[in-house]
Amino acid sequence: LVGSEMCIRDRDCEIACVISNHDDLRSMVEWHGIPYYHVPVNPQDKEPAFAEVSRLVKQHEADVVVLARYMQILPPELCSEYAGRVINIHHSFLPSFVGAKPYHQASLRGVKLIGATCHYVTEELDAGPIIEQDVVRVSHSDSIEDMVRFGRDVEKMVLARGLRYHLEDRVLVHGNKTVVF
């Protein structure tokens, strides 16, 4: 959050609201005077939650949607409706370790670097145009918990930089690639 706040602080923008499928950050968000909406997702019927998210985004006239800790795959309709306006932070150096539990996957593969990727959301999971990435070195002696801890710091910085680039209109998307000026 600190990195994201630094990114926002110097920009002519505001956080319209926080929509979360977790209720654990409500008090912190509301302490900052930001509207908070808890929209739980029923695994058997996700459509009502996605409809509510879309309604809230429209109600608050949000220009960009940031997915952080959301861990849900957006339906194709939302991906199309908000194309180029939904940014995700994924906790791996994409295209490696797509989807859930990338640190577990990285540990099983014995990688020497873990990372984070900030990208635009598309219908294909974790395959949208990449805005920003970074890595940190790990060793064979690091546990999955160590990797998660190291990765959190990288994720914050990558998201902050990626969001800043987007807000400054520095990202040119060409097909599935980006050029960041």
Which sequence ranges carry the predicted segments?
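Short, small-residue-biased leader/transition segments that mark boundaries at the very start
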Residues: 1-2, 6-8
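Short, conserved loop/helix-junction motifs that constitute active-site signature segments
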Residues: 9-12, 80-82
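Short internal beta-strands
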Residues: 12-24
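Short hydrophobic/aromatic-enriched beta-strand-loop microsegments
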Residues: 13-16, 36-40, 85-90
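Donor/substrate-binding cores of folate-linked one-carbon enzymes
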Residues: 21-22, 32, 49, 63-181
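Acyltransferase donor/substrate-recognition loop-hinge adjacent to the catalytic core
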Residues: 27
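Adenosine-nucleotide cofactor-binding segment
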Residues: 30-62
